[in-house]
């Protein structure tokens, strides 16, 4: 199942991107109108059952409505650094082997699909990085690797931006270089984990950084130093995760961006595509 947020008549609606854009709040017969609220309320299973039973006459979103950010106020966005060896080499670094490197991003960094990524004029080289984002479906704290993925509601394509020139001055500037406005894009759809796994094991899922329509770098989840389950389990022993939190699992390769570029994240071969212009 896929869920998408669209803006229509000054409001945001969650819809099924099924051709009709059926409104999820009408399918559920009420409840939270936003995707984060649906996750917090634990309504995904009920929604899946209702959709399996068949969606007949229900209100639909105007198909010309623009796609919005899936949600804008997660309690936590956790990013992972240097989780692919090849990307670590791009920066002249070694990929961490004993435990993952991580950082937090504020929700002010969020933009939606198709919205501009703004490169500040005074920070030098900026890169965009395609990543697989895990969306947490229920509160998760101190869980084992074997059970970690049961706490994941689904996945989203992510574009995580970095002020790389500043980072190369001093790696302790990591929080600073990751937290400029528009430095985190995700969407357009939340793809539930069962749909992702129906296409094959997560380890085989391809993650690709796109630059002006061409593949800049790609790899599969199997190429990660720490698997998604290991990342979530490890960090759940540091901090609790809550529904709607996003764990962005690292990039196979970063691409320098300048105004006029279009960058993208593709998951699988056509499973999901996120693009943003650069200004």
Q: Language model features by range: what are they?
A:
Residues 1-96, 214-215, 264-266:
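N-terminal non-catalytic cap/leader segment that marks the start of a structured domain
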Residues 5-10, 45, 59-66, 87, ...:
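Catalytic-pocket segment enriched in acidic/His residues
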Residues 23-27, 93-94, 144-156:
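Short Gly/aromatic-enriched secondary-structure transition segments
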Residues 67-69, 90-92, 117-126, 140-147, ...:
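A generic local secondary-structure boundary/capping motif
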Residues 72, 112, 127-129, 242, ...:
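Residue-level recognition of short, solvent-exposed, well-ordered loop/turn junctions
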Residues 75-78, 100-102, 108-109, 116, ...:
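Structural motif
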Residues 94-113, 128, 265-269:
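Structural signature of FAD isoalloxazine-binding scaffolds in flavoprotein oxidoreductases
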Residues 108, 113-150, 157-161:
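Non-heme Fe(II) oxygenase catalytic core, chiefly the N-lobe of the double-stranded beta-helix
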